[in-house]
Amino acid sequence: MGRFIFVSFGLLVMFLSLSGTEAGVCCPFGWSGYDQNCYKAFEELMTWADAEKFCTQQHKGSHLLSLHNIAEADFVVKTTVSGSKDGVIWMGLSDVWNECNWGWTDGAQLDYKAWNVASNCFIFKTAENNWSRTDCSGTHNFVCKSPA
C-alpha cells in the first residue's frame, strides 16, 4: 500500500510539473500560460509596427503584449522576458491607430496604467516594472500575447 501511494504521488508531481505554468491554460508549444492567455517572448529586434505584425502572424488572436494588472506584469517579467537584452520590450499600447486615443492592439480596454511621459508607442521596462512612451521606429525585443 505504501508503495502504491509513493508511486501515485510521484506521478502526480510529474503531471503537475509537465502541465504548464497554469493548469487549464492550453498554449502552443513554447508559449507560457497565465489567466486564460498565452505569452511568448521574441529576442528579435523590431520596430513597433513590425513586432505587432509579427505577433498577429504567430497565433490566432495574437498581438503585442497588453497588461491589465501588476500580477500579470510580474508573470511576464518572471517567465517570458529573461531573453530581453536591455530589459525593454514593446507593448501593444499605442495611439498609432487612434490618434490620441490610447488602446491595446488586441482591442482590450486600457484599465491599468503605469507610464511616464515621451512619444507614440510604449515600452515595458521590465527591471523597473513600468512603462515609457517612446518613438515607434526604435527597435526592441517584444512579447506576443494570445487568448488561450
Swiss-Prot record:
PANTHER family: MANNOSE, PHOSPHOLIPASE, LECTIN RECEPTOR RELATED. It comes from the Eukaryota. Residues 34-145 form the C-type lectin domain. This is Snaclec 6. GO terms for molecular function: toxin activity. It comes from Bitis arietans. SMART domains: CLECT. InterPro entries: C-type_lectin-like (IPR001304), C-type_lectin-like/link_sf (IPR016186), C-type_lectin/snaclec_domain (IPR050111), C-type_lectin_CS (IPR018378), CTDL_fold (IPR016187). Expressed by the venom gland. Interferes with one step of hemostasis (modulation of platelet aggregation, or coagulation cascade, for example).
